[in-house]
Amino acid sequence: MTQRVTEVRREPDKSDHPESDHSESDHPERGHPDPFRIAGTVYASRLLVGTGKFASHPVMRDSLVASGADIVTVALRRVDLSRAGEGDVLDFVPAGMTLLPNTSGAQDAAEALRLARLGRAATGTSLVKLEVTPDPRTLAPDPIETLRAAELMVADGFTVLPYCSADPVLARRLEEAGCATVMPLGSWIGSNRGLRTRDAIEAIVETAGVPVVVDAGIGAPSDAAEAMEIGADAVLVNTAIAIAADPVAMARAFALATIAGRMAHLAGRPRAGSATVAEASSPLTGFLGAVPGGLPGLPGGGG
């Protein structure tokens, strides 16, 4: 069975990336002492992109290129595993991108494992984004079945990236089970409501020993920047790009926001102060006191 997409990733073509006008030394990830790694593989981009909800496969392809993403996730239920159909979604994934099949729609651990095995057989990749979402109203991840599936998949040789609730205890359990990342939700899938779980994500970031990828609910580039600023290692975005008026432009905006957020985190973003009054950034008290007679129009100044 011929593979269309493999785990082997290229060094991204500079023409594909929003930061392509900069040198390698200017890139906030390449050559930095904390590059983005998943299971030992280094990726240049910290933006992961999904493939659902696009108006057409060509629009999806162009948006993926504009995003500069190295990793693209696709629901196994949308893939023609028999490879008999024409125009399958995988045919429009740009060459060299790392495919991350997901088990979207799985109701329990057994179904998730079955989908993952089918995907591995069809694509040749052991990477899998684990999703177990039995509640059709919220698509909330089932914590019990997610952990159970993670244990089964790791034992079966998969590199598991689990979508999970923003629960620090569950995140620790998934890490202990051998997951390569944890992927806490920002808010409900497809809701575009941003980081409603910010406090919990910060707690996960503080203790996680594997990359933290914020997944679900990221509705604007500012949400992606916020996630990166508080220390997330990466973000996964789909709906906000796919349903934008201009998906290609939105993909580029998310790419730049992810880079900016990461740079802000590395630069040491100041925490919000506790003061309830303003604090001048440039006090003039000493300066005014040194001016004979003060300044006209200011307290103590000339008329």
From Swiss-Prot:
Gene3D superfamilies linked to this entry: Aldolase class I (3.20.20.70)
Keywords noted in UniProt: Cytoplasm, Schiff base, Thiamine biosynthesis, Transferase
Predominant location category: cytoplasm
Keyword Cytoplasm: yes
Stretches with biased composition (Basic and acidic residues): 1-35
Record GO terms (molecular function): thiazole synthase activity
Biological pathway: Cofactor biosynthesis; thiamine diphosphate biosynthesis
InterPro entries for the chain: Aldolase_TIM, Thiazole_synthase_ThiG, ThiG
One GO term (biological process): thiamine diphosphate biosynthetic process
Pfam families in alphabetical order: ThiG
Subunit text: Homotetramer. Forms heterodimers with either ThiH or ThiS.
Protein name listed in UniProt: Thiazole synthase
Native organism: Parafrankia sp. (strain EAN1pec)
